[in-house]
């Protein structure tokens, strides 16, 4: 049986301001009602595959668990990377976990869009016989334009199956770096090159066998998995061992070295959604070529991407623009300059701002909060707690809190005294007092929190107990 390995790391900074460090693009709903991670998992339902193994950053663990839960998928196989070490070590962790099962690993990125899912699944099935025979299969995207933003794979000798004389796969002749425009055009004209998708299919044992040509990676990952511990839904690998691992991609560490690399062409409407212009290209457009999301009005606007998260966005007499509005930031960019969005993100970092890290609305394992106003000595939040969930037992040294219940029922414990509050009731929590909040009801609990004090940072917290295992 195929075991999907979903690579859910990365921060997608080219899609700022929607994509942030703590809520990157793979968790966003960009092309429908599901997040990109959820769409990636749903896409392989017809493959009769096992539940996926998701590899993600420590900071994203609760987002991944919640999105898997929404799909009714098991969340028991979420491998947490203490640091990012690229794709070769990440896949090694999953392969080591699956080694005894002799699993066939389908390695997928969580942030790709594939329009023709039927063709995608058929191509996976066609490639299966090569992977089962011990080949390391990579999927090459049939190019549609001389793209300079992707690496390429040059195909070599055709491989013919016993069933027919029509080749479905080729030996990999070479992997090539991102070309200039002239070279990319020559690749397109030759018909021998494919875009490097970063998707793979191989047996777990074959990957580990080939990885041993890099004993530094193999040893570090083996030690990391040998000392791994299970925490709630998560597999925490040993931090010291994994941090010692080199940062290396699968292509460099394995695929360029092996004699068994095979490329299977894939023509299924693939996109890695690497920029706002690529998202515009794959999205439905109006008669003027505009893509609109949210509350948007336009007049004499052409070929624009207009996104309104809150409030009204209007565009008049403009063309070839990207306009993305969120609760705390607005991006306006020419479609020809979208690769430079990363430079704006770097400027935000240099100015020690926070807009590249988190949205105004922040998700937690118990629910979410929205910072709706703040000043020098106060902050106002709208807090939503899911049924059956609650915040940790905690105290703060520098701030007091006022909670006003807007909807639902709150079970509040202050200095050991339990109170049940409902709509239009409130409570005051003094500085330094131990307290906790739970939602015992069947509907979401909504409240307004007003903080006041000399220091209002999220790190002013001492947790005494926490059901989510946070420090």
Swiss-Prot record:
Its EC number is 2.7.7.13. One of its GO terms (biological process) is GDP-mannose biosynthetic process. Pathway: Nucleotide-sugar biosynthesis; GDP-alpha-D-mannose biosynthesis; GDP-alpha-D-mannose from alpha-D-mannose 1-phosphate (GTP route): step 1/1. InterPro entries: EF_Hand_1_Ca_BS, GMPP_N, Man1P_GuaTrfase/Man6P_Isoase, Man6P_isomerase-2_C, ManC/GMP-like_b-helix, Mannose-6P_isomerase_type2, NTP_transferase_dom, Nucleotide-diphossugar_trans. It is an enzyme of class 2 (transferase). It catalyses: alpha-D-mannose 1-phosphate + GTP + H(+) = GDP-alpha-D-mannose + diphosphate. It holds the Pfam family NTP_transferase. Belongs to the mannose-6-phosphate isomerase type 2 family. NCBIfam families: GMP_PMI. Involved in GDP-mannose biosynthesis which serves as the activated sugar nucleotide precursor for mannose residues in cell surface polysaccharides. This enzyme participates in synthesis of the LPS O antigen. This is Mannose-1-phosphate guanylyltransferase. It comes from Salmonella montevideo.
